[in-house]
Amino acid sequence: MADRRVGNRPMGRRGRLEIQSGTCNVCSAPCSSCMHHNAEFSGSKSDESSDENSHGVLASQCSFNGDNLLRSSGVNAPGSSHNTSSEASHLVNSNHDTSSENAESKEIIRSSDISHGPLLDRPHKDQDSMKVDSCNDHQARSTLGQGKVKEKSGAKNNEEKKNTLTGSSKHSGPRVGKSGENVLLNKADESNTSAMSDSESENDPEMLELDVKVCDTCGDAGREDLLAICSRCSDGAEHTYCMRVMLKKVPKGYWLCEECKFAEKAEKHKLETKRKRESEVNVNTQISSKRHIDKFEAVPDSKRLAVGAQIGSPKRSVLPRMSTLSRETSFKGLEKPTRKLAHYSSFNSHSSDDTESTRSTDSQLQSPKGSFLKSNSFNSLSSRSKVRPVDDDMLPRQKTGNENSSLEVKEGFSKNVGKSMSSRCIDVGSSNCNDSKVKGSKQLKDWSTEANPSASISRGNSSIPYAKSPRDLKDLQSDGKQGSLSKQARHLSRNRLEDIVASVGDSSKNEKCSSSEQISSEAKCKDELAQVDGVPRSREFREAGEKTKDAVGNHQKRNIGEDNNKGNRLRAAVDAALRKKPSFSKNRGLEQSDLPPVSNVDSGCNKALKCLSSKVPVIRDWPVGFQGLPGGHPNLRTDKQTNTVNEKQFTLAGTDATTASQSVEPEVNDPSVQSVMRDLPVAAPNVLSTTSAIPKPEYIWQGDLEVQKSRNLSAMHSGIQAYLSTLASPKVVEVVKQFPEKVTLNEVPRLSSWPAQFQDTGAKEQHVALFFFAKDIESYEKNYKPLVDNMIQKDLALKGNLEGVELLIFASNQLPQDCQRWNMLFFLWGVFRGKKESCSNPPKNTPLPASCVSPNRDTFRHENPSNKKSLTDRTLSRMQSCMKEEDAKEGKACSGTEKENAFSVSYGEGEVDVETEEGEIGVSPQLKYEKTAGPGTVKSADMNQRVNVDDLNKEGLCEGPANKKLKTVTGVETGCSIVRRDTSVHKFASRKFV
């Protein structure tokens, strides 16, 4: 044992130094280039840590032959150590003459295997077939001749190693464990292999390149302790200081290089895209299945088998459905324009489900018979016409619109469907498309009638959004023939309207329509005027299908631009027309019975128009309702267009007068138009009386109203604005400008403050001096509306004394029925009433006899109108006698005679306003043209009976006490006494004579 230990170390050193001189026993190649050798040396070096005793034992190992233990021929020879090291990794399956065969070979096996028969084969006969993992257990393989032995070394063999060494030193073959002998030989091979691996790794440059990792960024090994290695790929590595986001230390666990990160992101993106596509496919599959079910119910029985096959396989319902439409790809290229075309071609016959109907059309287009017919009438599957059918002669024209629309889709102009091609019969409530399923065959049959002039004209006439009269509308619905249309054309030609006035009239009729309806109305009005001469217009409509959508868009923009300048053109046209023809010819008065009646167009443009035969109603611009604007201005837009002033109608002398009056109405509050109207001669006074009283745009006063109620209660109503009437007197402006910010009014019964003038004729819009509105919505809801409602319910009025005049405010329910609302709401209006002023030197202590009291206003209510003139004469004679008596007693009349308030104005020669204790103030000068045909009318010849107070005083005609003052027809007050003999005294003082 001592010799073996001593000889162990020199053998190990020599083996490591002279390892290159050996050759492989398998392939006879140098050990440095042999693959068998390299594979054996690739094991771990962990076994080098085994103690030196094992190396010494391996150096002096013996081979066994049978049950006898024989020494190897070379026992621990120092010179042969380099030969043994080259064969250390091979296992030799030797027979009985193993020693002699190894002696003849060039290399001597110092560490030989144990060739055993009964020792190894008895307990473990399957020892040769043991398989060991080369990576985990670092086992070596060798083959020599026919035998192969695979050994496994483990941690348990380390304990058996010492026993094996002890048994082999004593040459006790039977005592050596069968597995221990194999482990002993394996350990000997591993020790020599580790020695060979060290020397081989130092001399082989290829092994160095495989083991060293290089940074992908800098390309250098750098600091290996800061080199992070990719967890996915084998060659990805990067220093922590070379990373895009520098790390302080090498990341532990899962880390990916840049390339792997990019690849991972790409994979995730692909997966997400794939999921989205799958979800879309699922949704489309469900929708497609649902559509197939609906489609299955709509199609005939002959097609249900084919459709049922698609319903049974929903996965195939997406792509195969497109293949079935391949024949009509050019026609069904775009889905949305096709739906829009279907909407227009059905003439606004709305279906319950346009989308499903369009889907059902796809299958119907494939049928060889009547496919185009079904595409035009597919909406009839789900709906029926809800209005009266159109005439038979209009069907060819409607059919042409459908056919042109379909041709446009084939040519790629699916969006170029003009509004003129769709029926606008809904606007006039005249007609709509009949059941397409019933008349579809007739449309297809009458294809050749496209160029028929009567069909073209009848269609154009039916498309007009305004009708001349219910009679004309009835003719269109019943006849639809060229004869009735020619009659209408003759009516139009008989108008002889000037171009500018006609265009203004048309624009004024349509100014309250929506923009789309205006464009359609102008286009169709032009069609009607073009068809007056009877020239067929079918070619123009045929060419409509060939226009591009750009041309249609430009045309619509041009029409919109023209409509924007409508107001300026209207004013200019009215001014020019009225100045050009200031007088109305009378020789054409009987001619207007042949004219089409003037249409009454309301704000909705959707009602039938009334025919008033030969009498034209006075169109007025009375506003109805309240709508506050940002600056406190009311909205002057009107919702009513026609009304008769003084409940009368008059006949204008000619067509030009009719057109002019219609054109003036929307701009009646415009100063330029008003000036033109005032410049008109007196030949047509009734035209001036048609002017309406409306608020001016700017408010004249804004403040609060303090209403004094009974029992010393008061209520404050803030945010009230006063607007001056367009017919108010200029004196009203002077008074209103002196109003304080808070006006105090008394709440009184309306009958007690109702002017006597209103008791006979009633209050009219011309009597309104001021309009009262709320400045905003909040003020209206909190203050204005409760005040108006209270006054209407309790029949109250507001009364106040301001600047020497009396202000009376009433609710609008006291006005005529057509003037009671502003934007559909009640409002407040006010008038002024002049007050009497006493003489400068009145007697103070003279009692007032009961007979000298003025007759009560209530007694005037039931007087006999036939006695008015005689009562006037008696009253004048009484005043003369009163003045004479007073002059006889006092010698002079009251020098302090004063006129009544300046608001009572006399207009023209021979015209005087007569008022007593009360009189309306603020009436427009235009009321001078308003003539009353009753017995109370006093003509200018009778008004020459003016009474001069000075002359009466000089003649001494005034008698009686001076404490009673009466007003003469000149508005002069004087002190006199009247013996009251008759209670039914004429109340001429409260009427206005013209």
UniProtKB/Swiss-Prot annotation:
The keyword Metal-binding applies. This is ASI1-immunoprecipitated protein 2. Residues 45-54, 119-140, 148-163, 469-478, 536-552, 858-875 have a biased composition (Basic and acidic residues). Zn(2+) 1 binds at residues 215, 218, 239, 242. Keywords: Metal-binding, Transcription, Transcription regulation, Zinc, Zinc-finger. The keyword Transport does not apply. PANTHER family: PTHR33304, RING_FYVE_PHD ZINC FINGER SUPERFAMILY PROTEIN. InterPro entries: AIPP2-like_SPOC, PHD1-3/5-6, Znf_FYVE_PHD, Znf_PHD, Znf_RING/FYVE/PHD. GO terms for biological process: negative regulation of gene expression, epigenetic; negative regulation of transcription elongation by RNA polymerase II; regulation of photoperiodism, flowering. Expressed ubiquitously. Disulfide bonds: none annotated. Residues 371-384 have a biased composition (Low complexity). Disruption phenotype: No obvious developmental defects. Enhanced accumulation of intronic heterochromatin (HC)-containing genes functional full-length transcripts (e.g. IBM1, At3g05410 and RPP7). Increased expression of At4g16870, a transposable element (TE) of Copia-like retrotransposon origin, associated with methylated status. The double mutant aipp2-1 paipp2-1 exhibits multiple developmental defects, such as a dwarfed size, early flowering, small leaves and poor fertility. Component of the ASI1-AIPP1-EDM2 (AAE) RNA regulatory complex composed of at least AIPP1/EDM3, ASI1 and EDM2 and may contain CPL2, AIPP2 and AIPP3/BDT1. Part of the BAH-PHD bivalent histone reader complex that contains AIPP2, PAIPP2 and AIPP3/BDT1; the BAH-PHD module associates with CPL2 to form the BAH-PHD-CPL2 complex (BPC) for transcriptional repression. Binds directly to ASI1, AIPP3/BDT1 and CPL2 but not to PAIPP2. One of its GO terms (molecular function) is zinc ion binding. Residues 60-102, 417-435, 449-464 have a biased composition (Polar residues). Pfam families: SPOC_AIPP2. The PHD domain (212-263) recognizes specifically unmodified histone H3 lysine 4 (H3K4me0), binding affinity being inversely proportional to H3K4 methylation level. It comes from Arabidopsis thaliana. Together with AIPP3/BDT1 and PAIPP2, cooperates to form a BAH-PHD bivalent histone reader complex able to read histone H3 lysine 27 trimethylation (H3K27me3) and low-methylated H3K4 histone marks in order to regulate transcription, especially to prevent early flowering; promotes AIPP3/BDT1 binding to H3K27me3. CPL2 is subsequently recruited to form a BAH-PHD-CPL2 complex (BPC) in order to silence several H3K27me3 and low-methylated H3K4 enriched loci, including AGO5, via the phosphorylation state-dependent inhibition of Pol II release from the transcriptional start site (e.g. Residues 39-182, 187-206, 342-567, 839-875 are annotated as: Disordered. A zinc finger (PHD-type) spans 212-263. The gene is AIPP2. Zn(2+) 2 binds at residues 230, 233, 257, 260.
